[in-house]
Amino acid sequence: TVLMAGQGRGGHSYFALDITKPLAPEFLFAFENDIMDSRIYHWDGAGNRQSLSYLSSITDEYNYSKLGESWSVPSIVPMVENNTVKWVAAFAAGYNGGVNTAYGSSIYVIDLENDGKVLKRVDLADVNNNIANSAPASLVSVTADGTSKAKYKGSLLYVADLEGKKWKFNLTDKDTLYDLTPIFNAEATVENDRMEFYQMT
């Protein structure tokens, strides 16, 4: 059993614990996007820390540079890759104050079985509406064990972004893995205040 949490408005980071034994939890990993110093910090299960500069070559598996304020509660869900089911954490990249386009407007999928390394980052489109898009809301997950209507293995995820757009994100064995499909657009502007901060229900 894995517990994963972020710092909310307090930072741009997440950590994960193995709480299979509640009285003896084990640290799994943590990562932080330091936007002030333009650095990525990553801690593995042994507590070893890596410090990676934006200016150097950051491999995709450690590229958390789009992580904003960590509002999004991670969805721990099954994903099908190469006909194998694996458990991952998926979350939106968080809040950017509505003004900074450098981070926040993405969805992350990370490997819970390999120190939280990034499996995929998918960026959300930013339209011309005077809002710097981001995704502070948590994702909604629909899994095969949660509904008899599901004819797939893995998970479908749904998320709203700050600009009022709704997206479907595919982590199933049907269609294209990591496919991101727009399903609704509220056409948010600063004037109409249709911005989305919360999880869809």
Tell me the role of every PLM-derived stretch.
Residues 1-201:
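A fold-level detector for beta-propeller and closely related beta-sheet-rich head/sensor domains
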